[in-house]
């Protein structure tokens, strides 16, 4: 799509979102989690359950309780799987790389390994934090697969899952409702989530990447386009602005992902997105796939988005 039409399309999208929110261009925020009414007249092929209605999101029927859709959970042996299990065009090229591993918060319930992948040539550095919420499984499944990525240039840091205890127990929280993604920049002397947030934040500060990817999933459904699933969130983009909107438009043009994505911002206070952008001046993109879709579709979307950026930056 020519850039002038893309800019026009972006303007129309922003106008639509702003009219729904009643805001001005400087007041772009994530969507309110307000339930929407599901149509009882729509033809459905799903068997309903007590307390659940049927909604259709991007052509897919799913069950909805008035606030959240029913999670399409799947326990995959992800470390035995390959990129090709989620798409024939994913990470097909192979390049020689060097790798090293190190651990954050050693000996704690939050202990997590960071894998550092280095291509043969110098280039951009990307830091991927996948699964700060442990029950957002497609996010950290994608992160586990990305540990097998190779690069022709540049460097990749991958921590997946970032919330190891939450992933182990399939819960959003680290423990006792401690939300890792509301704990940044964290504290060396705080609770478990705050200590882990601090370790991740300090590692990003040390590495100084060009971009941070924050891989997530959403389960709350509101109405139409105004819900968090299938979205890209940013706070400050800096030099990554053109790349971000080219990525967004690629989903809307049908070039990328199973359905179009929309954008929101800024990231919430205490989130990795908001904190690294405002305190370190490093652009961060939060990817939110939608948990009402089947797991393969969600993992594939996460991988396609990361691959798009790596190719955009000529790292692959």
Residue ranges and their predicted role:
Residues 16-20:
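C-terminal motif of bacterial Sec signal peptides marking the signal peptidase cleavage site
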């Amino acid at each position: 799509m020519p850039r002038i039409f893309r800019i026009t399309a972006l303007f129309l999208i922003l106008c639509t979102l702003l009219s729904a929110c009643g805001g001005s261009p400087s007041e772009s925020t994530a969507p309110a989690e307000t339930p929407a009414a599901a149509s009882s007249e729509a033809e459905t092929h799903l068997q309903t359950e007590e307390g659940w209605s049927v909604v259709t999101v991007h052509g897919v029927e799913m069950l909805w309780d008035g606030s959240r859709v029913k999670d399409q959970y799947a326990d995959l042996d992800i470390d035995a799987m390959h990129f090709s299990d989620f798409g024939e065009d994913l990470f097909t090229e192979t390049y020689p790389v060097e790798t090293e591993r190190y651990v954050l918060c050693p000996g704690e319930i939050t202990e997590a390994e960071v894998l550092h992948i280095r291509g043969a040539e110098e280039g951009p550095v990307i830091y991927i934090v996948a699964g700060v919420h442990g029950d957002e499984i497609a996010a950290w499944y994608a992160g586990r697969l990305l540990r097998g990525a190779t690069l022709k240039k540049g460097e990749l840091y991958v921590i997946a899952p970032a919330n190891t205890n939450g992933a182990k127990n399939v819960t959003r929280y680290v423990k006792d409702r401690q939300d890792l993604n509301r704990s940044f920049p964290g504290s060396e002397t705080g609770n478990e989530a705050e200590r882990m947030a601090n370790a991740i934040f300090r590692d990003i500060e040390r590495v100084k990447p060009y971009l941070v990817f924050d891989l997530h999933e959403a389960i709350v459904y509101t109405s139409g386009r105004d819900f968090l699933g299938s979205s890209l969130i940013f706070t400050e983009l800096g030099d990554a602005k053109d790349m971000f909107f080219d990525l967004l438009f690629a989903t809307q043009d049908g070039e990328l992902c199973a359905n179009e994505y929309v954008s929101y911002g800024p990231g919430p206070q205490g989130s990795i997105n908001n904190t690294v952008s405002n305190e370190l001046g490093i652009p961060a993109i939060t990817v939110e796939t939608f948990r009402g879709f089947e797991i393969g579709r969600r993992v594939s979307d996460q991988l396609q988005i990361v691959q798009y950026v790596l190719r955009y930056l000529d790292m692959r």
